[in-house]
Amino acid sequence: MKIIELIMMEDEKRAGEDTISLVYDPAIEENFVALSKQQEGRVALSSEYMRMTLSDADKRIVTGAALVPNKPIYRNDGGDEYYIYFSKDTTRKASESFLKNGYQRSTNLEHEEGDRLKGVSVVESWIIEDEVNDKSRFYKMNLPVGTWMVSMKIDNDEVWKEYIKEGKVRGFSIEGWFVDKMKTKTKTEQARLK
């Protein structure tokens, strides 16, 4: 089965990621954690494997990987099976482009095009620089250097109660414009990744 490295397009206005979708089954196979405030003021961590215990003072923040570098991601386009991956460099460029272009509020559910969620916003973004001394370790995540992490604030009551708390969505999935690195040498073919 072929393996394709995707890179950023040269057209900066269309290049890279432009949406983060909340999904049940993220292609990067990494789920987020939902943060809630306990009565004593301590932070509790919850994931898809644990039933969340939330007080009235929910933080309503989910934190997880948006993109993991060099992780093979299975694709099947009309019977054409292959894997894609993003290098550390492309992952960093995608994260920078996302913020630079102001896409922090560009979120949807399960890649529903044109259906942008209100009251959902990326409030934190970082690249893991050190596997041991990174904030992701605090959240019990074991991810490689170069991973793009995000925290999303969920002020939308419906999304928080019906999707996050009920476990209907468990992770992030990116959408954006990328190209096959090998094909850029001969002909630029762009692909909208979802």
What name fits each language-model region?
Residues 1-194:
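Signature of dsDNA virion morphogenesis modules
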